[in-house]
């Protein structure tokens, strides 16, 4: 079976109607429900609404450009969960993990053959 290319149908975020005009209207998407709304009635030239057709392929959904899915790791025992799934998932070390624990996690991942996406983050070289 041939590998499926990762194609994102839309990378631009859906913004709320008139969020660029008024400060009080936030950017996070809300469905327009007004009776005269041009966006709800899908007039030409208005912003597009999220719909099922923008969904990505199920096989490549949540995939990073390298083809792996990110798995959040908080301790060394979490890395061992990826031992059987190292071709599907890549470890991503959580932001609240200390530098000392990060070194242990990266060493364990290297021994198990698990890819770490942010291996160099918060780790200083010995001077």
Curated annotation (Swiss-Prot):
CDD domains: Ribosomal_L32_L32e. Keywords: Cytoplasm, Nucleus, Phosphoprotein, Ribonucleoprotein, Ribosomal protein. Its main location: cytoplasm. GO terms for cellular component: cytosol; cytosolic large ribosomal subunit; nucleus; preribosome. It holds the Pfam family Ribosomal_L32e. One of its GO terms (molecular function) is structural constituent of ribosome. InterPro entries: Ribosomal_eL32, Ribosomal_eL32_CS, Ribosomal_eL32_sf. The modification Phosphoserine is found at residue 77. It is found in: Cytoplasm; Nucleus. One of its GO terms (biological process) is cytoplasmic translation. Component of the ribosome, a large ribonucleoprotein complex responsible for the synthesis of proteins in the cell. The small ribosomal subunit (SSU) binds messenger RNAs (mRNAs) and translates the encoded message by selecting cognate aminoacyl-transfer RNA (tRNA) molecules. The large subunit (LSU) contains the ribosomal catalytic site termed the peptidyl transferase center (PTC), which catalyzes the formation of peptide bonds, thereby polymerizing the amino acids delivered by tRNAs into a polypeptide chain. Belongs to the eukaryotic ribosomal protein eL32 family. Component of the large ribosomal subunit (LSU). Mature yeast ribosomes consist of a small (40S) and a large (60S) subunit. The 40S small subunit contains 1 molecule of ribosomal RNA (18S rRNA) and at least 33 different proteins. The large 60S subunit contains 3 rRNA molecules (25S, 5.8S and 5S rRNA) and at least 46 different proteins. There are 2 genes for eL32 in S.pombe. This is Large ribosomal subunit protein eL32A. The gene is rpl3202.
């Amino acid at each position: 079976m041939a590998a499926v290319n990762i194609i994102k149908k839309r990378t631009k975020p859906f913004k709320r109607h008139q969020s660029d005009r008024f400060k009080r209207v936030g950017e996070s998407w809300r469905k327009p429900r007004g009776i005269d709304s041009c966006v709800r009635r899908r007039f030409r030239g208005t912003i597009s609404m999220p719909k099922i057709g923008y969904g990505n392929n199920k096989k490549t959904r949540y995939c990073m450009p390298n083809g792996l899915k990110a798995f959040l790791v908080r301790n060394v025992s979490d890395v061992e969960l990826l031992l059987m799934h190292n071709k599907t998932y890549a470890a991503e070390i959580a932001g609240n993990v200390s530098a000392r624990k990060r070194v242990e996690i990266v060493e364990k991942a290297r021994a198990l053959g698990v890819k770490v996406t942010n291996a160099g983050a918060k780790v200083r070289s010995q001077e």
